[in-house]
Curated annotation (Swiss-Prot):
It comes from Homo sapiens (Human). Keywords: ATP-binding, Cytoplasm, Kinase, Lipid biosynthesis, Lipid metabolism, Nucleotide-binding, Phospholipid biosynthesis, Phospholipid metabolism, Transferase. This is Ethanolamine kinase 1. It is an enzyme of class 2 (transferase). InterPro entries: Kinase-like_dom_sf. Residues 26-64 are annotated as: Disordered. Its EC number is 2.7.1.82.
């Protein structure tokens, strides 16, 4: 039985006053020993029912016949509803380019609870993907950074020149991630040279190519030589045309609403529940903040593009020899506001395990980053490369205000993970940190005004 209780209105007011009084000092919290790659587009919005049918003409109560005008009105209403639903679906549909290779689906389930069962499942996949490999010589390496899924590297020999990555989906992550959309995004990005090869999917995961290089951490993303590569690669993804002629629409608010509907109301463990009730905003406050964000941020004028949506440091692979970067993990990719993707990346300068928001990029670094991004984005879109100070200023304001939505989104995500995930990580603590930072930075960034 859950120990949760609803907060009173006075509790809510006290909570907001407390948040408004947070210190501007760096927030630095030890979360856990795990780090990095985490985090389904929301369900389609419900199709509204057509208008109630008139119950007959005056003086003919109980009759079910309709006049010709009434029939016409009903027919038009139904057509409008259907057309609206189709338009919404197409505006969120990720179009895989013709000629893209199909991805095989293997009827294999990889058990990850016991090491020998995990190896059996991985070897079953390798029989299809690397039939020339001797099973006795295959080495399995567990990557421990992930806090959504389990990731295993499979290779033979002493060097990791040819590595097959086996990703096993985390418990209940189907609540958070639309796996079909993930595969579409993977294929689109692969077709444009922005993703490794996707070898196959299987019953509870997928296999893909290992990218040679170094997974970055917060100290790397502040390096101008590296962050300019990151800005250019993100601009390349944002410039991809994957909407087949329809004007794309962001699914941010729908996905956020879905996450909100899934957050727990309490925890069975008494100590965890006390922490949850004292440090997490009430559902009423969260609902009010979501309404406010949608009204304000949707009107900032940020373009909707194909976004990565989870560009934390460990999802960026830097190859010093080749002088380039590649992004990995496309679970949360999809159409979103351009400024959200950048703001989310800036939030990730603080890290995941040891969160330190004093590492959030200052205005000077952001200005350099955003200028490099705009130059590359215009180049990829065929608009030239000249960037004005006003363009940089507008994007700066949009990015920092959308950073609020990023904090809120991952706060909701972490609450759901705290309920379901079997990975060793303090998800509740992470949710607390993200919501605290949301309320801390809200007054400062909302005071920024887009120039006329």
């Amino acid at each position: 039985m859950l120990c949760g209780r609803p907060r009173s209105s006075s509790d809510n007011r006290n909570f907001l006053r407390e948040r408004a009084g947070l210190s501007s000092a760096a927030v630095q919290t030890r979360i856990g020993n795990s780090a990095a790659s985490r985090r389904s587009p929301a369900a389609r919005p419900p199709v509204p029912a057509p208008p109630a049918l008139p119950r007959g003409r005056p003086g003919t109560e109980g009759s079910t016949s309709l006049s010709a005008p009434a029939v016409l009105v009903v027919a038009v209403a139904v057509v409008v509803v259907v057309v609206s639903a189709v338009a919404w679906a197409m505006a969120n549909y990720i179009h895989v380019p013709p000629g893209s290779p199909e991805v095989p689906k293997l009827n294999v389930t990889v058990q990850d609870q016991e090491e020998h069962r995990c190896r059996e499942g991985a070897l079953s996949l390798l029989q299809h993907l690397r039939p020339h490999w001797d099973p006795q010589e295959v080495t399995l390496q567990l990557f421990t950074d992930g806090i959504t899924n389990k990731l295993i590297g499979c290779y033979v020999g002493n060097t990791m020149e040819d590595v097959v990555l086996v990703r096993i989906y985390g418990n209940k992550t189907e609540l958070l991630v639309d796996r079909d959309e993930e595969v579409k995004s993977f294929r689109v990005l692969q077709a444009h040279g922005c993703a490794p090869q996707l070898y196959c999917t299987f019953n509870n995961g997928l296999c893909y190519e290992f990218i040679q290089g170094e997974a970055l951490d917060p100290k790397h993303v502040c390096n101008p030589a590296i962050f300019r590569l990151i800005a250019r690669q993100l601009a390349k993804i944002h410039a991809i045309h994957a909407h087949n002629g329809w004007i794309p629409k962001s699914n941010l608010w729908l996905k956020m609403g879905k996450y909100f509907s899934l957050i727990p109301t309490g925890f069975a463990d008494e100590d965890i529940n006390k922490r949850f009730l004292s440090d997490i905003p009430s559902s009423q406050i969260l609902q009010e903040e979501m309404t406010w964000m949608k009204e304000i941020l949707s009107n900032l004028g940020s373009p909707v593009v194909l976004c990565h949506n989870d560009l934390l440091c460990k999802n960026i692979i830097y190859n010093e020899k080749q002088g380039d970067v590649q992004f990995i993990d496309y679970e949360y990719s999809g159409y979103n506001y351009l400024a959200y993707d950048i703001g989310n990346h800036f939030n990730e300068f603080a890290g995941v395990s040891d969160v330190d928001y004093s590492l959030y990029p200052d205005r000077e670094l952001q200005s350099q980053w955003l200028r490099a991004y705009l130059e590359a984005y215009k180049e990829f879109k065929g608009f030239g490369t000249e960037v004005t100070e006003k363009e940089v200023e507008i994007l700066f304001i949009q990015v920092n205000q959308f950073a609020l939505a990023s904090h809120f989104f991952w706060g909701l995500w972490a609450l759901i993970q705290a309920k379901y995930s079997t990975i060793e990580f303090d998800f509740l603590g992470y949710a607390i940190v993200r919501f605290n930072q949301y309320f801390k930075m809200k007054p400062e960034v909302t005071a920024l005004k887009v120039p006329e």
